[in-house]
Structure formats: C-alpha cells, structure tokens
Amino acid sequence: PLAIEVIRRRLEDRGGGLARVGGQLRLVEGMALAREEDEFKLTFYNTLTCWIAIDPLLALFGLDRAALADADRVAAAVRTLAARMPTYVTLKDVKKRWGNGQEDIFPVLQWEKLWGDMTTLPEADTLFFSVPRPRGQQLKEQAQLDGWLRDGSAAYIENLCAWE
C-alpha cells in the first residue's frame, strides 16, 4: 500500500535512508543505526513523500472504510500495529523564555513512532522509486537554503506553482 520517493544521498543529508535489512528493502532511521558512520554508506535518502493506496493500508491495520466510523476500533488497530514498530527515545532541549532575554533550558525525553518505519512491516508491500533531487530534497536547517537556491531546486519548486 506504500510507495516512497527517495533521492540520491549527499554527504549533507542526515537522518538515515534506504537500506536492505534481513533481505528486506526498507527505510532506516539514522538514530537506529548501530554506528553513526554507517549512515554514510547509504545510497538513497528518504524524501518524506509517500504515495498511499488507502484500502490496502486500511487492511494492514485490519480495517476497512466502514470501520473508520468506529473510533474505538480504529484506536485499537493503530495501537496494535504501532506495537510492532520501533519506538525511539530522544533527549531534547526545550527552552522556556521569560522576562527580558531570560530563558531556562529543560531536558525532555521524547518518545517517537516514525511513519517511515511502516516499511519494516513485510506485509506493507512497500515500493521505492528514485526521483530528481529538486523534487524531494529536505531542508533541515537554514544553512542549506543557499545551496538549495543555487542548485536550481528553488526554481524547480517555484515553477510547480502559480504565484499571485
């Protein structure tokens, strides 16, 4: 039910990518890799663009369209499938600003389930296809904007839209 767009990976791309694990092609998060440098061995990077066939996806959850009206059944199905997927625990710094230029920083644990980990499920029948970098490039920090503008990616996106 899933088709995921990937791009050729560049050195500055962070966060994992496409890998073969136990004979199965799937997305692997950078934080799930045993060694940080293993990320540089990955050839393709996730664009975060996913095409979904609704009825097969619902079937993966043990649901159909009619079942969507039953909130309790949907919640139970989501919890059951989520229990089969990895959970990541990350430490984040949360800032609380107060007064004039004052702030406190609190360490916070964040539990995450990631959509890309649906590809860990063999019955998800996931396909991957390579797209041009301008179509799927992720920008994760401001420092990437200059390169994005210079390499033609910004112009590519601009030409997709009618700006008024």
Report the location of each language-model feature:
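Catalytic core of tubulin tyrosine ligase-like
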Residues: P1-E164
